[in-house]
């Protein structure tokens, strides 16, 4: 099986559909179909900050329900899930845009989209081990010796990265460069931390190229070990791209 992984769409529905088509898929009845039988994998953070989070949810969740795509959650997915469940969360850092989109829907539409997303989140794996263990898709990455583990510590790492506990002046967390020490045999494909170009280190690649911050949306083709990108239509924000 061959896969195309996309991460950190963040409500950029138009760029997502453009990238899916550039990767060679046609969308039939809401489902992406590739003539070579390739499968799309979404690596989390479908929503927040961008203009069309609801459309992204409908597309990914709809295709997932039909068994046509794979999906693993990101930290923004986790927060949206808790928000929809009625748990106390701070509606900020992008969640406010998705919440505003939901409020514009009719009561029935809001209920339908909320239930669709919650089902997606509840039925998805924390991370995906594919191609006989040669490929791992995890939103913020995973250490080699944690592959196959599902403890709370591993969950926190997969969703939030290798955080130090310290923050930048604007409040964003400072993270360790776990990829530099990665020594596993499997390819780990992840996102979470925006980079201007896909960052390949050892057998890891960060494909969050900051579409929602005006850069580009990137897909990773496996087993080809190639990337394909489309430009963002949003304003470029240099401040969102930091050294690892």
From Swiss-Prot:
It catalyses: P(1),P(4)-bis(5'-guanosyl) tetraphosphate + H2O = GMP + GTP + 2 H(+). Inhibited by EDTA. It is found in: Forespore. NCBIfam families: PRK13625.1 (NF010148). PANTHER family: BIS(5'-NUCLEOSYL)-TETRAPHOSPHATASE PRPE [ASYMMETRICAL], METALLOPHOSPHOESTERASE. Asymmetrically hydrolyzes Ap4p to yield AMP and ATP. Does not hydrolyze Ap2a or Ap6A. Also has an ATPase activity. Was shown to dephosphorylate phosphotyrosine but not phosphoserine or phosphothreonine from phosphorylated peptides. Involved in spore germination by controlling expression of genes coding for GerA and GerK receptors. This is Bis(5'-nucleosyl)-tetraphosphatase PrpE [asymmetrical]. It comes from Bacillus subtilis (strain 168).
């Amino acid at each position: 099986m061959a896969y195309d992984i996309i991460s950190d769409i963040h409500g950029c529905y138009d760029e997502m559909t453009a990238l899916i088509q550039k990767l060679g898929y046609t969308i039939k009845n809401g489902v992406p179909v590739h003539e070579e039988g390739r499968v799309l994998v979404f690596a989390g953070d479908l929503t927040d900050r961008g203009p069309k989070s609801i459309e992204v949810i409908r597309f990914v969740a709809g295709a997932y329900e039909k068994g046509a795509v794979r999906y693993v959650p990101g930290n923004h997915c986790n927060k949206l899930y808790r928000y929809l469940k009625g748990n106390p969360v701070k509606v900020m850092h992008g969640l406010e845009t998705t919440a505003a989109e939901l409020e514009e829907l009719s009561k029935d539409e809001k209920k339908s989209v909320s239930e669709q997303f919650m089902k997606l989140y509840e039925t998805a794996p924390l991370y995906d081990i594919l191609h006989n263990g040669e490929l791992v898709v995890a939103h913020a990455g995973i250490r080699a010796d944690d592959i196959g583990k599902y403890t709370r510590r591993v969950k926190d790492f997969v969703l939030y990265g290798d955080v130090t506990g310290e923050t930048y002046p604007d409040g964003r967390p400072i993270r360790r460069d776990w990829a530099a020490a990665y020594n596993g045999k499997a390819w780990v494909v992840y996102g979470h931390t925006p980079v201007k170009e896909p960052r390949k280190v050892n057998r890891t690649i960060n494909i969050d190229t900051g579409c929602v911050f005006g850069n580009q949306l990137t897909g990773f083709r496996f087993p080809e070990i190639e990337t394909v990108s489309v430009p963002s239509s949003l304003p470029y924000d240099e401040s969102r791209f930091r050294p690892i």
